[in-house]
Amino acid sequence: FGNASMYGGFCLAYVAYVSLKNKITDINQLKEYVELTFSPERVSFIKENIGNLWNVAIEISEEYSEAALLATVLWWQLQGNRFMGECETPQSVIKLANEILQISNDKVADFCSGIGSFLVSAIEKSPESQFYGTEIVRDVKEVSAIRTELISDRVKIEQKSVLNIKDNLMFDKIFCDYPWGIKAKDSIGSNEALQAIYDEIPEVQKVAAGDWIFIINVMNHLNKHGKAVVSVSNGVTWNGGINTVIREKFVKKGFVEAVIALPSNLYSNTGIAC
């Protein structure tokens, strides 16, 4: 699936799947189907990444089975930048999160859902649950929406900052693999979201890194008896100063059930442990 675009291979596989699924063998008919069927955002995403390779998509649809193309779309891997939020969560972390969360007929969220790898896995384990994802990057959001829509009609993916989710949107289970290295001042969404976090633990105002803002935001959207898994850099667990005070408050409030140390080099684009 050669293409200069980061998402070119994914789009070729997806359009090839659409072509085969709907028995479309003409380039113009395929373009028309895409434009009439999908949202303007989806159409733009496909056109920008597939370029002039519509004929290649049709050729691929004639070469591979529907099952093979579906598998390619569902398990496509993104090689991105961990610190820009464009790095796929490792399958080992996803498997661990699913084991901890034990999703079963729950309302489930993936904050900073990326290309939807956790949601795809969670849907397979508990198709009767309801799923929600939020991702700020348009192209990444489209990838996750495409993948999850193919296997469930009980999922909603929104393009927005995870810190701008409605206050009354609550979940039974939350997974969050947020982008590391973001400063607190750069990670804030609305002023209301900022104030809610500061009201919960005021010391967060004095921390430069944005980690605690993402973590507390998860807690703000968790039901009373809910459970969350948040992937953090290991510095969150041992940084001194005001971070020590914040950790103590988390423990005293009963927010922490366990801390699991994971090895370095789990993520493809950083050797930092989590």
Predicted regions and their residues:
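Mobile active-site "lid"/loop adjacent to the S-adenosyl-L-methionine
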Residues: 178-213, 235
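Short, surface-exposed amphipathic charged segments that create phosphate/polyanion-binding patches used
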Residues: 172, 271-274
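Conserved S-adenosyl-L-methionine
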Residues: 80-183, 233-234, 246, 252-253
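Acidic-residue sensor for enzyme active/binding pockets
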Residues: 10, 135, 211
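Conserved Class I SAM-dependent methyltransferase catalytic core
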Residues: 206-272
